[in-house]
UniProtKB/Swiss-Prot annotation:
This is Phosphonates import ATP-binding protein PhnC. Part of the ABC transporter complex PhnCDE involved in phosphonates import. Responsible for energy coupling to the transport system. ATP binds at G37, L38, S39, G40, A41, G42, K43, S44. Disulfide bonds: none annotated. NCBIfam families: ABC_phnC. GO terms for molecular function: ABC-type phosphonate transporter activity; ATP binding; ATP hydrolysis activity. The gene is phnC. It comes from Staphylococcus haemolyticus (strain JCSC1435). It catalyses: phosphonate(out) + ATP + H2O = phosphonate(in) + ADP + phosphate + H(+). It comes from the Bacteria.
Amino acid sequence: MSQIEFKDVNKVYPNGHVGLKDINLNIEKGDFAVIVGLSGAGKSTLLRSVNRLHDITSGDILIEGKSITKAKGNDLLMMRRNIGMIFQHFNLVKRSSVLRNVLSGRVGYHPTWKMVLGLFPKEDKVKAMDALERVNILDKYDQRSDELSGGQQQRISIARALAQEPAIILADEPVASLDPLTTKQVMDDLKKINEELGITILINLHFVDLALEYGTRIIGLRAGELVFDGPASEATEEVFNDIYGRKLKDDEKLGVE
């Protein structure tokens, strides 16, 4: 049984734009799967459909053999709890401390009223501190999040996802706004999490060299259709030219020197 399974998935937006077309795709446990393609190819739509930030129009998406497409109420909450999310623009509460932001990854485990009052048990604080240590910013735990650099803020968001104790992490262009050195640090963090904790990573990346360096698997989308799915070792320049529908530009190839 695949960890994530797309079955004949289609997404059509209200304006008629086709986001995804007839997607059949399996993601296996422990994959570091990188989604590539032009802007507007459907990368974010595919990624965000996994935890239903975007609902699909038809088809089904299964997580561990169970339909998240059909899940409702508490069942949906329990399934989402198992899926961490990292965004391009961090999505942090800027005036809150680093620790408080990471603790927000635990909200799915407790009643809403406790979370509003900030009543996190000691075990949650231990998990949050462990997550911060794993991404090497434990020493910043009591600082305001908006006092830190972009790279450090992205590491907070990774720690928040880790504190959630997910089986899957979705990362939507997590390094798009970062400089090359910070990009490498963040990508190294994600790869380490994947290899050491066995957490499946499904990530959108703009730069082809990053996809090849870090991905075990490349998923290519063009105009909402799946045009390549295979090991990174098989993703040749010709394959990428086909995914993009043209030769790659220099600023699409190189992310980290």
